[in-house]
Amino acid sequence: MLSARIESPVLLQEGCPSMDSSSDKKEELRQQLRQAALEYHQFPTPGKISVTPTKGLLNQRDLALAYSPGVAAPCEEIVKDPANSYKYTARGNLVAVISNGTAVLGLGNIGPLASKPVMEGKGVLFKKFAAIDVFDIEINETDPDKLVDIIAALEPTFGGVNLEDIKAPECF
């Protein structure tokens, strides 16, 4: 399950800072929220997403069906009709959330690696509110033509692509 709680004493006891707070109090609350956010993203497992099997993998038979030799049957069906990829794989419920980190949330051009927490965050929104699985993909490329080529090459994997936080006009 993709849920967690922020257990910051400040947030639980005092709520959000009011507009009437002194600047010292606001800074203290901001620092406490920052620390709570860092802990939220780090514990108990770093990040906000994971990959979980949808099939039982309890014994040798399950493993043989999931991989070799059983996996050959759906592969052959997809060769016959590529639309079968939606029938036999997660593709139909899998979206790529892709960014190069050039225009992130008011943070600006922070690059692909630093944008990863934001893309994971977008992924958990897809999962929580639409039950859609997401892979976040951060690409170290700013040339628009190369970026398009990279993203287009990923098409066989995903049922959808969400471009996120790519600066204009490159995002168009």
Regions found by a protein language model. Name each.
Residues D20-F172:
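N-terminal ligand-binding/catalytic initiation module
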